[in-house]
Amino acid sequence: MSLMSDDSEVFVQAPTVANAELNIEAKPEANAQVNAEADSDANLGNNLGEQQTTDESAFGRNIGKFTAFVKEITGSGTEVEEQEKRNNHTISVDPSSNHENTSFEPTTYKILGRTYTSTTDASARVQELLWLSYRCGFEPIPKSDDGPQPITFFPSIVFNRLTLVNLSNLRSLLDKDHFTSDAGWGCMIRTSQNLLANALLRLFHTTGGQPQNFAVTKTEADVIELFQDTLSAPFSLHNFIKAANSLSLNIKPGQWFGPSAASLSIKKLVNDYNLIQQERRSERDSGRDSGHKVPTPNLKLHSKSADSDSDSDSDAISKRNSIPYVYVSENCDLYDDEINAIFELEQRPILFLFPIRLGIEQVNKYYYSSILQILASKFSVGIAGGKPSSSFYFIGYEGEDDLIYFDPHLPQIVQTPVNLESYHTSEYSKLKIDQLDPSMMIGILIETIDEYQEFKMSCFESDNKILHFHPLVTTAPRESSINQSWEEVQGEEEFVNLNIVKNEEDFVDLGSASTQGQNHEPS
């Protein structure tokens, strides 16, 4: 391993495999540019602004190389990339620009229940949403003895010096016994985090059903804190893996999640977190009754103090402080009496998750209009999944058939303190609906029984063919019964569905003796 440093960056050449193409060396012209910049610094630093711009460009180029490298090792190689070039479009709009396309009729954008005819307004809305992507250098996750091995090599990566607080961060990236990055295997977890994070952000930014401004606030910082890549953060990558393991899904670090595993993990993590919050509130209330002051939870997802003396304020705060109840339906059946009972008992919003497969190799055209109706609903919090070999977070659509999504496959370095700007992007990609993979997890956030009835009526009016509503539970709905632990991924696919048995055997049955102890590693 060799280190080369200049005034602004540290270049790390990590160990490489015997593939010369992965060993990306600095170009001669880049070295000449660095030397020229060093000479410029010696001349009283007259061109500091230009120097900073060049540094940022160098950082961008190297991150671009790293991203391309990750795509190569995760199955998104040249063949897939060429297909994406034909089908996908990446949009980056400067919100300060007033340029609109006046040659044609205005394009309509539907983004999580809001409608826009201005590209600038649509881009601004996209930038308000939270975006979670691959991270590198996070708290180590021990590998499993019979699971995949951590990636122990990287091409030349540029680290901004601010992200390298000490050498332990660098060493962690080269750890052979622990995962310190989810690049190549964590995209379904990241898109699930995207869905949950934006559901929470919407919930805590609303008052009486009316959205407030989505400026970067302490509320947003608190929501992001819940998803940090540490075991102490309730909705971290670490705890998704831990939850899946405790549910007998037996997913090991480095193995891929499907929509069902993701939805069940969210359900467990959120409901466990709610139990902890309820216990804390009970302790606080008991302390008040006895005259003793009990510390309030560190997490405050509201603007008022949790120590308000007003009973009405306390009740309102308690409601706003509640993470939603999670309801998972793999067959997309909803029973009115059961939903009503949950609202009465829980007294908090419900996050509905539907891990489904809408076809075999492709989404059946029968469901196209229903997918668009769900994304356009004001109760939608997006769709996770939906692309062969990858998982994306779909947040809406443009025109009639271009789905809009966030891509989690851009690796970012973990920063301390947390860089809030790294959880936002003005860029999104587009995918034709006929290119959508049938495996996905749909998210719907409903705050009251009246909203449930409103959503139900909107589905009836649009003849939604995905969701099925019933007045009574005639047969008690079963909890998810998945007897598959993880998927046997064909080729280098990263994302397949857990629910449908295919001839290619997309998953392994835990009950099958022939598969016990089988290792599964990214190729």
UniProtKB/Swiss-Prot annotation:
Q: Where is the composition biased (Polar residues)?
A: 89-104
The enzyme's first-digit EC class, named in words, is hydrolase
Keyword presence, Transport: yes
MF terms from GO for this chain are: cysteine-type endopeptidase activity; protein-phosphatidylethanolamide deconjugating activity
| Composition bias, Basic and acidic residues | 279-292
Localization terms from the record: Cytoplasm; Nucleus; Preautophagosomal structure
**Membrane recorded as keyword:** no
Instruction: Locate the active site.
Output: C187, D407, H409
Q: Where is this region: Disordered?
A: 77-104, 279-316
Pfam families attached to this UniProt entry: Peptidase_C54
Q: Which domain of life is it from?
A: Eukaryota
Query: According to its UniProt record, which reaction does this protein catalyse?
Result: [protein]-C-terminal L-amino acid-glycyl-phosphatidylethanolamide + H2O = [protein]-C-terminal L-amino acid-glycine + a 1,2-diacyl-sn-glycero-3-phosphoethanolamine
One GO cellular component term noted in the UniProt record for this chain: phagophore assembly site
The protein's Enzyme Commission number: 3.4.22.-
Q: Which UniProt keywords apply?
A: Autophagy, Cytoplasm, Hydrolase, Nucleus, Protease, Protein transport, Thiol protease, Transport
Name a biological process GO annotation. Answer: aggrephagy
The similarity comment for this entry is: Belongs to the peptidase C54 family.
Give a short account of what the protein does: Cysteine protease that plays a key role in cytoplasm to vacuole transport (Cvt) and autophagy by mediating both proteolytic activation and delipidation of ATG8. Required for selective autophagic degradation of the nucleus (nucleophagy) as well as for mitophagy which contributes to regulate mitochondrial quantity and quality by eliminating the mitochondria to a basal level to fulfill cellular energy requirements and preventing excess ROS production. The protease activity is required for proteolytic activation of ATG8: cleaves the C-terminal amino acid of ATG8 to reveal a C-terminal glycine.
Its name, as the record gives it, is Probable cysteine protease ATG4
**Which species is the source of this protein?**
Lodderomyces elongisporus (strain ATCC 11503 / CBS 2605 / JCM 1781 / NBRC 1676 / NRRL YB-4239) (Yeast)
Q: Which gene encodes it?
A: ATG4
